[in-house]
From Swiss-Prot:
Protein name as it appears in the record: F-box/LRR-repeat protein 15
Source taxon at top rank: Eukaryota
Quaternary structure, from the entry: Part of the SCF (SKP1-CUL1-F-box) E3 ubiquitin-protein ligase complex SCF(FBXL15).
A GO BP entry: G2/M transition of mitotic cell cycle
Length: 292
């Protein structure tokens, strides 16, 4: 009986690698655990390399910020089928040297997140533009190296872009945003927050060209006024969210029509703000010295 049981034993590595382990098992395990599994044996190392070569998503938030650049390059060395790439957690060390080879051999990327990667240059963005023509989402928040020329390249080659985060990309001016909106007509989500260069000119152009727009973030765009918000209300019937906090020239007269359409706005109506202030004053009332 023991001999028969021994013959019937099936070890993990005996299962078909690509058809079973890679496709139906490893896809449910965190990347951190899979990387650790490589250390068990040479066979496990080879197996995990097969998995990594067929991985559709690479997100470093699953591993942590401590991944060395050598490990990053090794993990993605053989992968040519990535669809989602996030290097946000590599911001301390990732440069064009590490990223360009990955971009160059993965032409099916749909989502790329480079937020906060301040050691990259425009060469990485141009590479994304030229290689990833089916790109739908791009995160570039706090990448101050993003300039007008690289955005033009993106607009020319990635017309199907649905969402882009340009928060604090302070080199960009109205001209670049206008050009982007004319080329990427399917845009549904756009952030140009924390950029004092943005004015009504580009906001109105976005509204008129991107009729499918659902989310617009103008936080801290100090030169944006009521006129462009009215244009957004007129041309963007699918708008769901508008952020205008710290836009001091945007008032309730332009926001009220959007509120009536149940658009989520991050600024409270004047009455609500007054009630909050009143509650604060009442809260301090016991401490007020009435003899003053």
């Amino acid at each position: 009986m023991d001999a028969e049981t021994e013959c019937c034993k099936c070890h993990l590595l005996d299962l078909p690698w690509e058809d079973v382990l890679v496709t139906h098992i490893f896809c449910y395990l965190p990347l951190r655990q899979l990387v650790r599994l490589q250390r068990v044996s040479k066979q496990f190392y080879a197996l995990i390399q097969v998995y990594l070569a067929n991985c559709r998503t690479f997100d470093l938030t699953q591993i942590g910020p401590s991944l060395p650049k050598e490990a990053f390059c090794n993990i993605l060395r053989d992968n040519k089928v990535l669809q989602n790439l996030s290097v946000q957690n590599c911001s301390d060390w990732v440069t064009d040297t590490e990223l360009l080879p990955v971009i160059g051999q993965n032409q099916h990327l749909l989502r790329v997140d480079m937020r906060g990667c301040d050691r990259l240059t425009r060469h990485s963005l141009v590479a994304v533009s030229l290689s990833c023509t089916h790109l739908q989402y791009l995160g570039l928040a706090h990448c101050e190296w993003v300039d007008s020329l690289s955005i033009r390249s993106l607009a020319d080659h990635c017309g199907g872009l649905r969402s882009i985060d340009l928060t604090a990309c302070r080199q960009l001016k109205d001209e670049a945003i206008c050009y982007l909106s004319k080329k990427c007509l399917k845009m549904r989500s756009l952030s140009v927050a924390v950029n004092a260069n943005i004015t009504d000119v580009s906001v109105e152009e976005v509204a008129k060209n991107c009729r499918e727009l659902e989310q617009l973030d103008l936080t801290g765009c100090l030169r944006v006024r009521n006129d462009s918000i009215r244009t957004v209300a007129e041309y963007c019937p699918k708008l769901q969210s508008l952020k205008v906090n710290h836009c001091h020239n945007v008032t309730e007269s332009s926001l009220d029509p959007l509120r009536k359409r149940n658009v989520e706005i991050d600024v409270e109506p004047p009455l609500q703000r007054a009630l909050v202030l009143l509650q604060d004053v009442v809260g301090f009332a016991p401490f007020i010295n009435l003899q003053i």
